Amino acid sequence: MNNIWWQTKGQGNVHLVLLHGWGLNAEVWRCIDEELSSHFTLHLVDLPGFGRSRGFGALSLADMAEVVLRQAPDKAIWLGWSLGGLVASQIALTHPERVLALVTVASSPCFSARDEWPGIKPDVLAGFQQQLSDDFQRTVERFLALQTMGTETARQDARALKKTVLALPMPEVDVLNGGLEILKTVDLRLPLQNVSMPFLRLYGYLDGLVPRKVVPMLDKLWPHSESYIFAKAAHAPFISHPVEFHHLLVALKQRV
């Protein structure tokens, strides 16, 4: 089976694996990788089918997690942003012995709105799937614009995300559709009640994709976890608030 693209940098005594979000690739971490690699051995990954990890079709969440795990260090802090947060969470559920701590960034265990659960309306996700077939690049760009909307640095943050996407060949439409299908259908709210490793959840107050209303709901559902909200961030707090983001991860390292 194909290997995925994987880059390791830094010599820290704790491994930190970074998993990107839908439509993107590991270049999205370049705004913080230098700082982080002075504290961690950093692992930058292109998820299967994204960026330089070619030769994969659409995968289920479970299969995506298994592919990523094949090349991973024995034990690491796993950090996942958005869709990557679901992949990191799946690894924490199925291989807890490999996970020193779980960090989710602007991620929800259930992205899709359900009864009494705030999220993205299913018809919005279905609409993105339909539009992918019609106008592939414009749909991805619209999704990226949603991620930074409302922040003081929205334009430059959106430019940074767009640059990341355009730096490498676009994923295949079926891979993008598969990722949207995961966002539309997966619900890890109850399974994640059972994880016992340190669990840090990071959110943006202005996030239009993961509503801040989920934060107190998950605080109650997962009392063993910790949450932090970036007051002026949207869906990409590591781009808009890199220093604050870095400090939170270094503080977590002291506790594992």
Curated annotation (Swiss-Prot):
Domain named AB hydrolase-1: residues: 15-242
Pathway(s) per entry: Cofactor biosynthesis; biotin biosynthesis
E.C. numbers: 3.1.1.85
GO biological process: biotin biosynthetic process
Physiological role: The physiological role of BioH is to remove the methyl group introduced by BioC when the pimeloyl moiety is complete. It allows to synthesize pimeloyl-ACP via the fatty acid synthetic pathway through the hydrolysis of the ester bonds of pimeloyl-ACP esters.
GO cellular component: cytoplasm
GO molecular function term, any single one: pimelyl-[acyl-carrier protein] methyl ester esterase activity
Residues annotated as the enzyme's active site: 82 (nucleophile), 207, 235
Protein name, as recorded: Pimeloyl-[acyl-carrier protein] methyl ester esterase
Predominant location category: cytoplasm
Catalytic activity line of the entry: 6-carboxyhexanoyl-[ACP] methyl ester + H2O = 6-carboxyhexanoyl-[ACP] + methanol + H(+)
UniProt record similarity statement: Belongs to the AB hydrolase superfamily. Carboxylesterase BioH family.
InterPro entries membership: AB_hydrolase_1, AB_hydrolase_fold, BioH, Carboxylesterase_BioH
Protein keywords: Biotin biosynthesis, Cytoplasm, Hydrolase, Serine esterase
Keyword Disulfide bond listed: no
